């Protein structure tokens, strides 16, 4: 009998699980919101610019230390039977550290400087830097495997943002890294990087390394910054990042033989958690945002796909990533905008407002739907890679009920996913089955039904809202030698299927006109006249 620990750092909260390595059964689970939340409107009563999303690294350490202690005590397992620890984290969430590995926001003279804080993945303050990087890559092949684009959420644009907006922060930062790398470095008392984070978000290749020619063309200082502050030993997924350091051995009472995995991006960890580890399996990790992931034995350049990295999920395979930056956040926004009569009716039925909205929306026939939404309320990641784009609603009349708008929000996220899927299929990477992971698919059968019919694919919903945490635990089990390969760990520890939604041919056909309208509006406001979206 052996156990592994999976630590999952999400957008607003963190989770820690203790899992049985033989079958993936979750024995104990801890979850807590980040104590300081996300700074997005103000910091120490000073207003923040639009699209700023900052966090406090101390919250991560609180989750780490309290969470692991809790699951060990709650489970009452023999601590000597814990063999490994895995970590997943949102990305690209960037942290700036001093010589002592302390976050710069802990410095008294920097605590009111927003650039000293962790830049959360959805921080979009670096769009100008991302645009300039795209401009400097014209007529080059530097971005072939990044969808010929650069996203403002990634590491390098965020570093350039700090160089331009707060050069003193860059001067005082000794280390710049993904927050996931910060956690694993602390756990192992070393300075290491994961190939998953640095490959997808830092323009690093497992054969060529960092693209310093590209960096120099963007800013002559950038190669030096990356070499001095970002370079470190890079560990691939499936390998051990090292043993748990003595300090944490003593704090938690764990064995000196406990191994730590390099961190994996949270959505990528969800692929492991659902067991979608074969070619042709398309995983949509649906949470506050959606990350779309596929594996293939080949690396091919795909326009508008946000990256492909070898060994980033399963050793020997290329992982492909795309995404939508507002899905759960979009539904939450819709709930908060619901008119009073909807809220009152939900209360009368003793139902959460979101559940009641979906109940009403489920009675709208596809043929009755006359509202189409561009779901860009937090910009667009794939396939346009433009965080300046804003959302739009088309087809409103004085008779439009609010639940029709809510249904259109759900449909828009499905249409966006279909556009992303088409990019893969047009490049000879076929999609056979869609796995829906994250908390939302289990809660919303309407969403799953809409996705199956819009995509015209079988959608498999996994019976776990802990897929990312479980994927991290699989990594811990693998490096802790409970399994000889990560693939074996994933197949043995994956969670069971909750249900399968098959597409219904009549509804598949009914959605085609709506999808066509979405595509026309998408190209009109996203490609031909994006400035109109900026003005809205």
Swiss-Prot record:
Record keywords, A-Z: Arabinose catabolism, ATP-binding, Carbohydrate metabolism, Kinase, Nucleotide-binding, Transferase
InterPro entries: ATPase_NBD, Carb_kinase_FGGY, FGGY_C, FGGY_N, Ribulokinase
Keyword Coiled coil in annotation: no
One MF term in the entry's GO annotations: D-ribulokinase activity
Enzyme class name: transferase
Catalytic activity, reaction form: D-ribulose + ATP = D-ribulose 5-phosphate + ADP + H(+); L-ribulose + ATP = L-ribulose 5-phosphate + ADP + H(+)
An example Gene Ontology CC term for this record: cytoplasm
Signal peptide: none
Presence of keyword Calcium: no
Pathway of action: Carbohydrate degradation; L-arabinose degradation via L-ribulose; D-xylulose 5-phosphate from L-arabinose (bacterial route): step 2/3
EC number(s) stated in the UniProt entry for this protein: 2.7.1.16
Top-rank taxon, per record: Bacteria
GO biological process: L-arabinose catabolic process to xylulose 5-phosphate
Similarity comment: family membership: Belongs to the ribulokinase family.
The protein's name in its UniProt record: Ribulokinase
Gene source species: Staphylococcus epidermidis (strain ATCC 12228 / FDA PCI 1200)
UniProt gene name: araB
């Amino acid at each position: 009998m052996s156990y592994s620990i999976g630590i999952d750092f999400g957008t607003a909260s963190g989770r820690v699980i203790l899992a049985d390595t033989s079958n993936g059964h979750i024995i104990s689970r801890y979850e807590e919101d980040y104590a300081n939340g996300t700074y997005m409107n103000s910091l120490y009563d000073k207003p923040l610019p639009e699209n700023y999303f900052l966090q406090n690294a101390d919250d991560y350490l609180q989750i780490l230390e309290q969470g692991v202690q809790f699951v060990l005590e709650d489970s009452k397992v023999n601590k000597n039977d814990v063999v490994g620890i895995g970590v997943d984290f949102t990305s690209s969430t960037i942290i700036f550290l001093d010589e002592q590995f302390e976050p710069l926001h802990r410095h008294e003279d920097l605590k009111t400087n927003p650039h000293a804080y962790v830049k959360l993945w959805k921080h979009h303050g670096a769009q100008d830097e991302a645009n300039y990087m795209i401009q400097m890559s014209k007529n080059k092949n530097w971005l072939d495997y990044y969808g010929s684009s650069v996203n403002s959420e990634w590491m390098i644009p965020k570093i350039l943002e700090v160089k331009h907006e707060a050069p003193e922060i860059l001067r005082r930062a000794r280390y710049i890294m993904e927050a996931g790398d910060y956690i694993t470095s602390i756990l192992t008392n070393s300075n290491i990087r994961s190939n998953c984070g640095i490959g997808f978000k830092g323009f690093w290749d497992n054969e060529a390394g960092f693209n310093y020619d590209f960096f120099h063309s963007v800013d002559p200082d950038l190669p030096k910054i990356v070499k001095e502050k970002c370079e470190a030993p890079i560990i691939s997924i499936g390998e051990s990042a090292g043993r748990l350091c003595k300090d944490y051995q003593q704090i938690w009472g764990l064995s000196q033989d406990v191994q730590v995995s390099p961190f994996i991006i949270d959505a990528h960890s969800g692929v492991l958690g659902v067991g979608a580890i074969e070619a042709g399996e398309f995983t949509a990790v649906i949470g506050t945002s959606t990350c779309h992931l596929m594996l293939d034995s080949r690396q091919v350049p795909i326009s508008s796909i946000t990256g492909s990295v070898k060994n980033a999920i399963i050793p020997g395979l290329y992982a492909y990533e795309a995404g939508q930056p507002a899905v759960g956040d979009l539904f939450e926004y819709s709930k908060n905008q619901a008119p009073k009569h909807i809220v009152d009716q939900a209360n009368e039925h003793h139902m959460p407002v979101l559940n009641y909205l979906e109940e009403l929306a489920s009675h709208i026939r596809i043929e009755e739907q006359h509202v189409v939404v561009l779901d860009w309320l937090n910009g667009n990641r794939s396939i346009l890679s433009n965080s300046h784009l804003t959302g739009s609603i088309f087809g409103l009349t004085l008779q439009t009920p609010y639940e029709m708008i809510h249904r259109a929000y759900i449909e828009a996220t499905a249409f966006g996913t279909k556009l992303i899927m088409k990019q893969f299929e047009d490049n000879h990477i076929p999609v056979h089955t869609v796995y829906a992971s994250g908390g939302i698919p289990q809660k919303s059968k309407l969403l799953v039904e809409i996705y199956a019919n819009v995509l015209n694919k079988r959608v498999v919903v996994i019976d776990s809202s802990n897929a990312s945490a479980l994927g991290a635990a699989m990594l811990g089990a693998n490096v802790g030698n409970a399994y000889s390969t990560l693939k074996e760990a994933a197949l043995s520890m994956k969670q069971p299927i909750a249900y399968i939604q098959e597409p219904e041919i009549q509804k598949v056909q009914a959605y085609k006109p709506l999808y066509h309208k979405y595509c026309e509006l998408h190209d009109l406001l996203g490609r031909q006249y994006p400035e109109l979206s900026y003005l809205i």
